[in-house]
Amino acid sequence: MIKPGIILGNIICLSGGFFLALNEKLSKIFFLKTVFGLILIISSSCILNNIIDRDIDKKMNRTKNRFLCINTNVFLLKILFFFSIILLILGLLVFYIYINFLCTIISFFGFFFYVYLYSYLFKRKTYFSTFVGSVSGSLPPIIGYVAVNNCLNRCCTILFFMFSFWQIAHSYSIIIYRYSDYKLLNLPVFPILYGKLKTIIFISICILNLFFFNFLLYFFGYVKFFYFLYTSFFIFLWFIFSFLSNSRYFTIKIWSRIMFFFSIFIIFMISFLMSLNNF
């Protein structure tokens, strides 16, 4: 229901932004409160996403055994809905009371984009849903950064574009790997509407943009050279591999699965090296 993998990934991204901004000592409790607030809001988002997507999930091999696909009791849905609202309110209160008002606004903004705009409004209607979803996916490192600095600046803008482009490339890799499921549901996603080849080209463009905005972090002095060197190397490898979908060594299904895991590795390394930047 609460998708532990998504929560863990977002905690890692938040940590990257948090420690990137950290120039002086803050208590460990402050960091844990920031993480706790994020966990509450993402848990709420995941529950509501499962409620909204339960009819789609029933038809997909990857998701057909999820809790709400098996248990369709209306009373249960109401309980889960109210529980998710409680989690949202608690998360916002944690940010408002213990962190700052700006984090509260940004986290609610992410919730709104993911639950209402992406899951409810756009996912079944337009391929732009992926871009809308990437907005919410880009916010955890910004929340971490703002928790420390209590301001939005140029670094936040760079982080926004970095993580948005990563999110799109990551999502399209999943869709290509699960292509038959999305084709069966006839969801209006880019790979179904425009084909795998154009999607692969678009993935490469997104990775190139990630490389560019990652460079801007170094260019404007937000990160040290060691961060730029190592992250550039890993992003470059990901970029090169994005051109190997039609090679004799991989089927496109195997390629897309490797791209998916590669993307997870990339975002982990970016966030991890950000966390080390000021140490």
UniProtKB/Swiss-Prot annotation:
Keyword field contains Ion transport: no
Matching InterPro entries: Protohaem_IX_farnesylTrfase, UbiA_prenyltransferase, UbiA_sf
Keyword Cell membrane: yes
Broad class of the protein's primary localization: membrane
UniProt xrefs under CDD domains: PT_UbiA_Cox10 (cd13957)
GO biological process: heme O biosynthetic process
Highest rank taxon of the organism: Bacteria
Localization of this protein: Cell membrane
HAMAP family: CyoE_CtaB
Protein name: Protoheme IX farnesyltransferase
Organism per entry: Buchnera aphidicola subsp. Cinara cedri (strain Cc)
